[in-house]
Amino acid sequence: MSTTAYPDTILIIDFGSQVTQLIARRVREANVYCEIVPFQSADEAFKRLQPKGVILSGSPHSTTDIGSPRAPQAIFDAGIPVLGICYGEQTMCAQLGGNVESGHDREFGRAFLDVQEDSPLFAGIWAKGTRHQVWMSHGDRVTSLPDGFTIIGTSPNAPYAVIADEKRKYYGVQFHPEVVHTPDGAKLLQNFVHRIVGVKPGWTMGAYREQAVEAIRKQVGSGKVICALSGGVDSSVAALLAHEAVGDQLTCILVDHGLMRKDEAQQVVEMFREHYNLPLILVDASDRFIGALESESDPEKKRKTIGRLFIEVFEEEARKLGGADFLVQGTLYPDVIESVSFTGGPSVTIKSHHNVGGLPERMKMQLVEPLRELFKDEVRLLGKELGLPDSFIGRHPFPGPGLAIRCPGGVTREKLEILREADAIYLDEIRKAGLYDAIWQAFAVLLPVQTVGVMGDGRTYEFVCALRAVTSVDGMTADFYHYDMNFLGNAATRIINEVRGINRVVYDVTSKPPGTIEWE
């Protein structure tokens, strides 16, 4: 993902696990820079990044299958520490001369691990002879070890639950330390990167700010730059970074695509012109966007249409400015991860993000993406570093495609106005209840379903509004927010009474996974 090798990088090779992103989060929390790469491009990434250590992820594959993914031999030839997690442990063993078999007792869920030997991996956390909760998810298991390895931890169904070659600094764990269900897992990963790899905790937002500003200057040179400003945290932080880097070479452009929240465009313009002194152009392109989306119900096509129109508008505005060479976007690391297929097939791509996979292949400007390596919570920390107020940094995430993906089916002005009003009421109720900061993201969805209702003495046949609220740390996984039912009742009553076009309100209790946070 990065074009520059950081001096202290951990490379995470993804074999297709659903929780690989959590490994990266735990490593970043230890103030160490890391990158996730799919196994197919691991050789290239290893040469480019020159990592100090490598972590091998879990996988739905079996090492006993012909053609199953393997780690590059180069990592074992490099003499650097390696940690294999679940499948990562198994493929490391298989590649180094051990044996892995299928068909043994499987372990899924909570298990208890017995520590057989002390190790730098356990230092300050677990001691020999103690037992600890871990989270297992495996069908295969190691049955014999490569030369140099010893068993340092066991569980009832995994006699090789933790293995180590202390001399070469190779470690394997059959459980998943990256998930919260392994209570000491984050500390184990910290031990690996700090004690075993020897990387110091130098990954901070202050350091990132300096590196990002320098990288922007190097990429842009004396070229003209425009920034795709939406008013959200991501694009705002990207704009401030770019402005710090290139000053008057930057012009910010806010496209009002008609898909923003209530009064949002005007609020954004006032804030940036008055408080940040950034050159800002407001473009009303609502007719163009809504017209293109009215007959489009496929969510992927909606995202790609929005991405295409964004670029068209920006290119037109750039021409009015006398030409621009670069376009700044607030693309985040989860956007990039979710837009990459890690097994080479389209079925693995969760959704195209309008500012990654949704962009047209032919662009007349080069992309500048200074936040491409950051998770959402890191962007907020960077925003604080740049001086943005807490009230702004703490705003809930809002997707680039806006209300278009909260309005399943074709998009019309009428539907958008109904949704905008319902969403504003819902967020107002959340703020009045003092819940806004406890929730990662909350919003209303206008369903393409109408139901019968009764208002006064008359029959109604109007839309259904779904309310969504989730808790999360980084947007990669999320749980629905557990409201008090009185709150939901009050919010539903206000929406039905105050918004014409809605006669029924429901609440979404789906977590991520299996669902995504947004409906489309």
Curated annotation (Swiss-Prot):
<dbReference type="Pfam" id="PF00117">
    <property type="entry name" value="GATase"/>
</dbReference>
<keyword id="KW-0658">Purine biosynthesis</keyword>
<keyword id="KW-0067">ATP-binding</keyword>
<dbReference type="InterPro" id="IPR001674">
    <property type="entry name" value="GMP_synth_C"/>
</dbReference>
<dbReference type="InterPro" id="IPR025777">
    <property type="entry name" value="GMPS_ATP_PPase_dom"/>
</dbReference>
<dbReference type="Pfam" id="PF02540">
    <property type="entry name" value="NAD_synthase"/>
</dbReference>
<protein>
    <recommendedName>
        <fullName>GMP synthase [glutamine-hydrolyzing]</fullName>
        <ecNumber>6.3.5.2</ecNumber>
    </recommendedName>
</protein>
<dbReference type="InterPro" id="IPR014729">
    <property type="entry name" value="Rossmann-like_a/b/a_fold"/>
</dbReference>
<feature type="active site">
    <location>
        <position position="178"/>
    </location>
</feature>
<comment type="pathway">
    <text>Purine metabolism; GMP biosynthesis; GMP from XMP (L-Gln route): step 1/1.</text>
</comment>
<dbReference type="Pfam" id="PF00958">
    <property type="entry name" value="GMP_synt_C"/>
</dbReference>
<keyword id="KW-0332">GMP biosynthesis</keyword>
<feature type="binding site">
    <location>
        <begin position="230"/>
        <end position="236"/>
    </location>
    <ligand>
        <name>ATP</name>
    </ligand>
</feature>
<comment type="function">
    <text>Catalyzes the synthesis of GMP from XMP.</text>
</comment>
<feature type="active site" description="Nucleophile">
    <location>
        <position position="86"/>
    </location>
</feature>
<comment type="subunit">
    <text>Homodimer.</text>
</comment>
<dbReference type="InterPro" id="IPR022955">
    <property type="entry name" value="GMP_synthase"/>
</dbReference>
<dbReference type="GO" id="GO:0005829">
    <property type="term" value="C:cytosol"/>
</dbReference>
<dbReference type="InterPro" id="IPR029062">
    <property type="entry name" value="Class_I_gatase-like"/>
</dbReference>
<dbReference type="GO" id="GO:0005524">
    <property type="term" value="F:ATP binding"/>
</dbReference>
<keyword id="KW-0436">Ligase</keyword>
<dbReference type="GO" id="GO:0003921">
    <property type="term" value="F:GMP synthase activity"/>
</dbReference>
<dbReference type="InterPro" id="IPR004739">
    <property type="entry name" value="GMP_synth_GATase"/>
</dbReference>
<feature type="domain" description="GMPS ATP-PPase">
    <location>
        <begin position="203"/>
        <end position="395"/>
    </location>
</feature>
<keyword id="KW-0315">Glutamine amidotransferase</keyword>
<dbReference type="InterPro" id="IPR017926">
    <property type="entry name" value="GATASE"/>
</dbReference>
<keyword id="KW-0547">Nucleotide-binding</keyword>
<feature type="domain" description="Glutamine amidotransferase type-1">
    <location>
        <begin position="9"/>
        <end position="202"/>
    </location>
</feature>
<feature type="active site">
    <location>
        <position position="176"/>
    </location>
</feature>
<dbReference type="InterPro" id="IPR022310">
    <property type="entry name" value="NAD/GMP_synthase"/>
</dbReference>
